[in-house]
Amino acid sequence: VLDYLSDINAQPDYCIGVSAGACNGVSFVSGQRGRNKRINIEYAGDKRYVSMRNLFRQKSMFGMDFIFNDIPDKLDPFDYEAFAASPIAFVTGVSDVETGKPVYFSKEAIQHDSTVLRASSSIPVFSPIVSFRGGKYLDGGTTDPIPVRKAMTDGCDKVIVVLTRDRNYVKSPEKMRSIYRRMLK
């Protein structure tokens, strides 16, 4: 969807994302058409990307160092300069472990590294808590999975929502909520 928006030169004023949406959004804002598809296809079967081995070695099923350091810095470089120069405002949502509320960071938080993206993509229980700018954060999707209200609060009057699930999907109540709470204490 984001590549199509690039193809038709649809350039929004504002882009917000949490978790995988934030990771995909930064490539869109930086103008790196095809980058998300390349990464997802090329590394989907790579044990460094996702594996049970990672869970035991790095305390995350996802190879967070591989995803947020090796890929953007070496294997399929992220264009930090183009991202910073883009006129599109970008916001990443994370979940504050201490308050249980969403916290949002502007594109300036992604100037030279992807720590805030890592935090926004760190799934509770399956990934370690990420410390960033004095806070402790996990996956932004746990507190604000579709941040339309934040976009409206920030002044957007028209919103395009790109979902990873069918629009009729309704999330079932969290079965592991009590386990999450105990593990995050």
Predicted segment positions?
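Patatin-like phospholipase
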Residues: 1-18, 26-185
